[in-house]
């Protein structure tokens, strides 16, 4: 394990361990103190959430999310109407009573990669506030480094997201914002996707999901396009 609170190395050495992980059996999960951030909340993220909850007098289900916009989207999807959304520096704490909505809300947070990062939590716990000028300089440097690896893409056109699934969810939402007013609400899934990508389409309430299992079946896609209601084609 790297000597860092942000490091993640997890071994599930036996099939029984894998089954215990998937079934969330306590005997397995008591040994898992770190993991892929969307599936296992980093200890620093949990500490930041607890500290903010104490500050605002909140309890129940606690979700430290990257932005108010992300919080509003997920609250609407999960039909949570009794939540508090408290600003905490450059992120927000969403809290609401434990209940039937807790698990679906948590799942959609997972699908969208909207939790704050462990480094963001660490900065908050250390009392380091976000500096907009420093953030802008850091983003400029990241874009400059990435630009040579992305053909014909200007640095200003590179959008940096919180995480991989966060980028996917944001991209789908952006396309929907453009296509929905045009009456285009059908998404074609071409081939099998990573599970969270699939769930974004399956759980959407304002779009239709069409699954073409064979990634080479371009003919199936071409037969759907003339209908004029396709918002996009998604494949991985």
Question: What kind of region is each of these model predictions?
Answer:
Residues 215:
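Catalytic core of soluble alpha/beta enzymes
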Residues 1-166, 170, 174-177, 190-204, ...:
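Conserved N-terminal alpha-helix of the aminotransferase class I/II PLP-enzyme fold
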């Amino acid at each position: 394990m790297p000597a860092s609170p942000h490091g993640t190395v997890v071994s599930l050495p036996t099939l029984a361990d894998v089954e215990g992980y998937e079934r969330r059996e306590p005997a397995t999960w008591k040994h898992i103190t770190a993991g892929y951030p969307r599936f296992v909340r980093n200890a620093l993220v949990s500490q930041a959430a607890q500290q903010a909850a104490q500050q605002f007098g909140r309890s129940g289900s606690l979700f430290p999310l990257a932005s108010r916009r992300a919080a509003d989207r997920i609250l609407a999807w999960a039909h949570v109407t009794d939540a508090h959304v408290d600003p905490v520096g450059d992120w927000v704490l969403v809290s609401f009573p434990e209940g039937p909505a807790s698990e679906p809300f948590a799942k959609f947070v997972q699908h969208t990669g909207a939790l704050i990062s462990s480094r963001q939590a660490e900065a908050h716990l250390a009392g380091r506030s976000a500096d907009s000028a420093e953030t802008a300089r850091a983003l400029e440097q990241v874009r400059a480094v990435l630009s040579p690896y992305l053909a014909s893409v200007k640095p200003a056109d590179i959008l940096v997201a919180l995480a991989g699934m966060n980028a996917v969810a944001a991209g789908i939402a952006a396309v929907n914002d453009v296509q929905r007013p045009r009456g285009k609400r059908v998404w074609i899934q071409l081939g099998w996707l990573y599970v969270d990508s699939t769930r974004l389409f399956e759980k959407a309430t304002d779009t239709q999901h069409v699954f073409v299992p064979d990634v080479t079946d371009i003919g199936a896609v071409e037969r759907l396009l003339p209908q004029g209601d396709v918002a996009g084609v998604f494949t991985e």
